[in-house]
Amino acid sequence: MEQFKFNTIEEAIEDIKNGKMVVVVDDEDRENEGDLLMAAEKVTPEAINFMAKYARGLICMPMTEEKLKELDLYQMVINNTDTKETAFTVSIDSVETTTGISAFERALTITKAVEKGAKAKDFQRPGHIFPLRARKGGVLKRAGHTEAAVDLATLAGLTPAGTICEIMNEDGTMARVPDLMKYVKVHNLKIVTIADLIEYRRKTESFIERQGSASLPTKYGEFEIIGYEDKLTGKEHVALVKGDIKNGEPVLIRVHSECLTGDVLGSLRCDCGDQLAQALRQINKEGRGALLYMRQEGRGIGLINKIKAYKLQDNGMDTVDANLALGFPEDLRDYGIGAQILKDLGVEKVRLMTNNPKKVSGISGYGIEIVERVPIEIECNKKNEFYLRTKKERMGHILNFKNIKKYDKSIKEA
């Protein structure tokens, strides 16, 4: 979808706020569809008629779980076998409607459902409007049109409920991105992607919560340890802080991903444990800095999957191909949470200890200024040379290998 020009999320929010519709596109590996979408409280008979005439799909009303409970709207089926887990409830009509199917009466049902004080007795079941339950956490938990509708309405400062309708071509086939680009031009609509909405939310909202702190004497020096909880995933991360890091001056920072095998068990397959030790020594030496210990084991795939990847590496694969063979990208880590922790710590400018350019761009993309990349290169050994070579050759890590003349592909990880 990169070759197409999409609107910004800010533009979409403004149109939603003003009662307009926008087209929202999901991932091409998901439904690969576009929906007309607007805020439920802004719905009019004209809008419903437009959806029915020019979108041609099923008109639905995404809502929060809390609102659905207030209206006593239970799930349509107990065992949801839909591959995308679309959470339909029983359909409804307002008790003030006749047949409930006209554009006027469908608009009435929607606006009545989002009114403050609306009660279950105000609606008859079944009906012609199909409420959908949005997941808590919105598009950050499920990248669907249901969640996008609630998120966009919320971001626009409106009631967290939307109205959506899938867009079909005139011949009845589903409209894909090339069709949708022509569609928005004809109807003068904005078009955005759920992927961009996810990125927007990650950059503009905070999902971490400080849970506690204490002093932590270590063999590397004295630190303050601060615990954080990721409210979306429930994962717990920690920051080890040395000295005053809030005075606006650039701070020496290491964002370190958890590696049980390297950090705790002393594995020679990687350089993680040595990098952790070197970073803490360097921060302590400078007297000012922080190390973030992020619970993103195995570049985000988790400990068990990392062990499975090790087995594939034992059989000749490198670390990248092993991840791909297990169905994962080469790197699943989310640097946004680390950036949010840095903001909570009062850090604005960073001297980042890393060999990974993607980590630099990943953190700077969240509003943290990276003033310097500080190398943290560890001397390799026979057990991890192939792994480190792979990081350099295939993942773009900046490694010098001063002791080694050439890349010997015959060297495998232990």
Curated annotation (Swiss-Prot):
Cofactor(s) required, per the database record: Mg(2+); Mn(2+); Zn(2+)
Which residues lie within the region annotated GTP cyclohydrolase II?
Answer: 204-414
Q: Which residues bind GTP?
A: R254, V255, H256, S257, E258, Q275, E297, G298, R299, T319, T354, K359
Q: Mind listing the GO biological process terms from this record? A: riboflavin biosynthetic process
GO cellular component entries? cytosol
Task: Show the active-site residues.
Answer: D331 (proton acceptor), R333 (nucleophile)
- Catalytic reaction list: D-ribulose 5-phosphate = (2S)-2-hydroxy-3-oxobutyl phosphate + formate + H(+); GTP + 4 H2O = 2,5-diamino-6-hydroxy-4-(5-phosphoribosylamino)-pyrimidine + formate + 2 phosphate + 3 H(+)
Q: Does the keyword Phosphoprotein apply?
A: no
Which pathway does it take part in?
Answer: Cofactor biosynthesis; riboflavin biosynthesis; 2-hydroxy-3-oxobutyl phosphate from D-ribulose 5-phosphate: step 1/1; Cofactor biosynthesis; riboflavin biosynthesis; 5-amino-6-(D-ribitylamino)uracil from GTP: step 1/4
**Which ranges form a coiled coil?**
none
Task: Cite the binding residues for Mg(2+) 1.
Answer: E31
- A GO molecular function held by the record: magnesium ion binding
Residues at which Mg(2+) 2 binds: E31, H145
Give the cofactor note: Binds 2 divalent metal cations per subunit. Magnesium or manganese.
Family, similarity comment: In the N-terminal section; belongs to the DHBP synthase family.
Q: What functional role does this protein have?
A: Catalyzes the conversion of D-ribulose 5-phosphate to formate and 3,4-dihydroxy-2-butanone 4-phosphate.
What is the protein name stated in its UniProt record? Riboflavin biosynthesis protein RibBA
